[in-house]
Design a protein with these regions (language model features):
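A cross-kingdom feature strongest in bacterial/archaeal respiratory oxidoreductases
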Residues: 1-58, 87-412
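Non-catalytic, well-ordered alpha-helical segments in soluble enzyme domains
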Residues: 63-88
Length: 412
């Protein structure tokens, strides 16, 4: 923003008026990428691929290529620019229609450049040694799960989709470790970061080292995170098990001052911590409570199985003597089995005919011989959670497919 003040005129090309538009003299409406023709070039710059629009521009907007063409006083539309590039720099043995069908074409050798060898330059980068402590913390800035760098702040599906680790929605928070949380509570007794100790959570069975909930809503203390003498901002604390003891994680892309109706008033802006020397990693930070609290929309209030032994194990000797050992572990062991006519059947047979506790409905016959029986339920789903990366595409897809409304922070 300081550099823009020295320019005669400044233009902002964007799909929406935002903070950058406010400090520029002019705003140019940018077409959505699904409304534009474009061209992609491979990493080795030997092939190119077309980018075709899905629909014509809905509004009177311009694509990136059209703006550049106007600056060159050519005033061509994006389709003509892509066609001209294809005819002059690609393999002429393929016509434009086939290029669109195949999705790729070779570039002429004169356009291919040798990539610089950056491997050795990367190896010469020496990491800065720093050992964080309770009074000198390390701060890591990462893109926000809901908004990335802020461009999705006005997307209700993104904002309401729970963060895969913290399960937070509609907000961001400073993530700290349980070790640092206990240190801060010792230093500031009124901080209320962790639930009060009970006989159960002292043994790690219920809500160990997580958060304080009040009337079903998470109550998070607001603190001031200060890095150096000129970089600080206020945000709520969230205790996240698994973090390094004295590392604080903060996300960028939230708390925008100029955004649409959906993203207005959400999150906390941590961009004040960005400076030329940090490169998203800062050291020597401190945390100080402000005395205020913030309600976080956390959709998961507990983090333990609470007596449900989902994963059950034993040794080979005990299994040989007690094949049904799994039924005598966890809360399920307190409900007696009701096998009925299948009392003398094998365990494998019982599992396919009569559910434990005697179901209120008749168990469907899913054997191959009866697989085509009219009226038999054919739908099923199998999810391997070992392959889950936390992308949460399934969550947004479910909300979209089933027309589930966006309800906002208060009702999520």
């Amino acid at each position: 923003s300081d550099l823009l003040k020295d320019t005669v005129s400044s233009f902002r090309l964007g799909s929406a008026i935002d903070e950058t538009s406010q400090i520029c003299d002019y705003h140019i409406g940018q077409s959505h990428f699904l409304e534009c023709w474009d061209m992609g070039v491979s990493w080795h710059e030997d092939t190119c691929s077309p980018v075709q629009p899905l629909l014509a521009p809905l509004f009177d907007t311009c694509s990136d290529l059209e703006v550049l063409s106007s600056l060159l006083k050519e005033n061509n539309n994006s389709h003509d620019i892509v066609l001209d590039f294809f005819e002059n720099f690609s393999d002429i043995s393929v016509n434009f229609e086939d290029f669109l069908k195949l999705g790729t074409a070779k570039l002429v050798p004169s356009l291919v450049n040798d990539l610089p060898n950056v491997d050795q330059a990367l190896l010469r980068i020496e990491p800065k040694e720093f050992t964080p402590t309770e009074n000198s913390l390390e701060v890591l800035l990462t893109p926000d799960f809901h908004t990335w760098d802020g461009q999705f702040s006005n997307n209700g599906w993104m904002m309401e989709c729970p963060q895969p680790i913290t399960k937070l929605t509609w907000d961001n928070a400073l993530l700290i470790s349980p070790v640092l949380a206990k240190k801060l509570e010792q230093k500031y007794p009124k901080l209320e970061l962790l639930p009060k100790a009970t006989m159960l959570n002292e043994t790690g069975q219920i809500a160990p080292d997580t958060a304080v909930f009040q009337d079903g809503k998470q109550k998070a203390p607001i603190v001031t995170l200060k890095v150096g003498d000129h970089h600080e901002y206020n945000a709520p604390l969230y205790v996240q098990p698994g973090l390094a003891d004295y590392t604080v994680v903060s996300t960028i892309g939230q708390g925008r001052s100029r955004v649409g109706r959906v993203g207005s008033g959400t999150g906390f802006n941590s961009c004040s911590l960005l400076h030329t020397d940090s490169n998203r990693i800062s050291t020597g930070a401190t945390i100080e409570p402000t005395g205020d609290f913030h309600i976080l929309a956390n959709v998961q209030e507990h983090w333990s199985m609470e007596g449900r032994a989902i994963v059950r194990e034993t040794n080979a000797k005990y299994y040989a003597e007690h094949e049904d050992f799994a039924h005598h572990m966890g809360a399920e062991s307190h409900s007696p089995p009701m096998w009925g006519k299948d009392q003398d059947a094998s365990i494998a047979e019982k599992a396919t005919t009569t559910p434990r506790g005697n179901s209120a409905y008749e168990h469907p016959d899913h054997t191959y011989e009866h697989s085509e029986t009219f009226g038999l339920h054919q739908w099923g789903m199998s999810i391997d959670l070992n392959q889950c990366t936390g992308c949460s595409a399934c969550v947004v897809a479910c909300q979209s497919e089933n027309n589930i409304p966006v309800v906002g922070k208060d009702q999520v």
